[in-house]
C-alpha cells in the first residue's frame, strides 16, 4: 500500500483548501493519473481533475506532486505524494481555470499577423527559430513554476514569452513583437531555467525565446534597459562588467606558463572577490595542481548575451579564445561564466574543456585528509550551475566529505535567488523580492553559513540576508570552506 494526499477545494463550498489522505494498493510504474482514478473508484472521492490523451501530448493533466509540476499521465506516483493543482485559479480540486490565460492570448494578438495575400513561401533556414517553439502543449507547467510570476505582475511569464517569440521569429509575421515583449516584462526573466526544467516538451524558453527576443529588441531599439547599457559601456571600455576597485586578482598573482590547467576568473573574482581566487590556488595546490591564471582574459560575455546586446560578444569571445587556448582544462568558479563558456562559446566556434571547480574536485576530494570544520551549513544551487550545466551532486559530495560539517538542504532546492538574467541591475525590485524569499528559507534552517559557487549569487544572498536581519549568517564560496578544511592554522 502507498499513501497519497490530495489537496481538495471547491470554491463557494469549502472555506479553504485542505488535504485528504488516501491509502491505495501499490502497482509497479503506477502513474499519478492512475492513482487519482483508483482513489475515486475505491473511496468514491469524486476528485475533480482533467485528462485526455494519456500520452503526454495534450497537457490537460498537469498537476503538482510534492511541489513540482508534472503531467499526471507520465509521472510515477510516489509513496507519501502530495498532489495539488497548478498555480492557477481553482475550479474544483485539481481542475483549474485557464480562461484568464486564453483571454490574454487573444488580447495580445498572439496569432500570425500579416497583410500578405495568397500562399507565402518560407525557407527552411528561416523557419528554424520559430520551429523550436511550436511544441508547446499548453500544460502551463512553466507558468506554475516560474519564480518571477509569483513576485511581479509586470511579467507575463514564460508561456507568453514563448508565444510572442514564436511569431517574432516567423518571417511572415508583421507585428512589432519585440516591443510587445518588452511591454509584457521581457526583461523581468532571471533566465533561471526552471521553466525549461519542468517543460514536458523540453522547450528552452530562456535560451530559444527570451534571450533571442531580447536580442531582437536591442536591434530594433526597444531594448535593453538603461542599466544594461551602462554595463555594456563598462565592458567595452574595461573588459569587465564591474568597476575596478583596488588591485585585481589577476595582476596580483604571477603567471605559471607550464601548467595545463587555466583558471578563468570571471569579473567579480578578479575585481571584487580575490579571496575566492586565492582559495582556489591553495586548494588545488593541496591536490598537487599548479594552476595558471592567464593574462588577457576578459568578461565572458554572459551579461551581454542574457540581455541581448550581442554586438560586442564576438570580440569578447575572440579575446578569451586567445587567452585560454592551449590549456587542457579551464576551471571556473562562477556559474554564469561556466555556462557561457560551455554552452554559448561553441556557437561562436570556440570549444574549450571547461569544468566547474566542483566537477574538478568531486572525484579527488577523498585524496585529501581534512581537519574538522564544525559548522552547520546549507547550499544554494546557482541556476546557471544546476540547470545551466547540470551540476548538482558534485557540490553535495564535497560538502558531505568535510569532517565536522553539518549539511542541511533548503526547503526548495534550486530556488532562484534573483540575481541573474540582468534582473539584479535592470529590475532590482524583483531581485530583492526573490532574495527575500531565499533569505526566509535560510532563516528556517538556523545555519552558520550558506555555501554556493557563484559570485553573483553570493553577493546577492549576502545583501538579502542583511536586509532581513540575518547578517550574522556567512555566505561563502565552496572553495573558502575547503580552504578552512585544508588549512593547518
Swiss-Prot record:
Q: Where does [4Fe-4S] cluster 1 bind?
A: 136, 139, 142, 146
Which cofactors does it use?
A: [2Fe-2S] cluster; [4Fe-4S] cluster
For this protein, the record's InterPro entries field holds: 2Fe-2S_ferredoxin-like_sf, 2Fe-2S_ferredoxin-type, 2Fe2S_fd_BS, 4Fe4S_Fe-S-bd, 4Fe4S_Fe_S_CS, Beta-grasp_dom_sf, Cys_rich_dom, Helical_ferredxn
Q: Which parts of the sequence belong to the 4Fe-4S ferredoxin-type domain?
A: 124-158, 178-209
Chief localisation class: cytoplasm
Q: What is its EC number?
A: 1.3.4.1
What's a Pfam family this protein contains? Fer4_8
For this protein, what reaction is catalysed? coenzyme B + coenzyme M + fumarate = coenzyme M-coenzyme B heterodisulfide + succinate
Q: Name one GO cellular component term.
A: cytoplasm
Q: Which residues form the 2Fe-2S ferredoxin-type domain?
A: 2-89
What does the UniProt cofactor note say? Binds 1 [2Fe-2S] cluster per subunit.
Tell me which residues bind [4Fe-4S] cluster 2: 189, 192, 195, 199
Q: Name one GO biological process term.
A: fumarate metabolic process
For this chain, one GO molecular function annotation is: oxidoreductase activity, acting on the CH-CH group of donors
Chain ranges passing through the membrane:
none
Thermal characteristics = Optimum temperature is 75 degrees Celsius.
Q: Which Gene3D superfamilies match?
A: 3.10.20.30, Alpha-helical ferredoxin
Activity dependence on pH, as recorded: Optimum pH is7.0.
Keyword list (alphabetical) reads:
2Fe-2S, 4Fe-4S, Cytoplasm, Iron, Iron-sulfur, Metal-binding, Oxidoreductase, Repeat
Where is [2Fe-2S] cluster bound in this sequence? Answer: 53, 58, 61, 73
List where in the cell it is found.
Answer: Cytoplasm
| Subunit-level organization | Subunit B of the heterodimeric fumarate reductase of methanogenic Archaea, composed of subunits A (TfrA) and B (TfrB).
NCBIfam families named in the record: dhsB, PRK06259.1
Name the job this protein performs: Catalyzes the reduction of fumarate with reduced coenzyme M (CoM-S-H) and coenzyme B (CoB-S-H). In vitro, is able to reduces fumarate with reduced benzyl viologen, oxidize CoM-S-H and CoB-S-H to CoM-S-S-CoB with methylene blue, and reduce CoM-S-S-CoB with reduced benzyl viologen. The enzyme has specificity for the two thiol compounds as the CoB--CoM heterodisulfide reductase. The enzyme is very sensitive to oxygen.
Indicate what this protein is called per its UniProt record. Answer: Fumarate reductase (CoM/CoB) subunit B
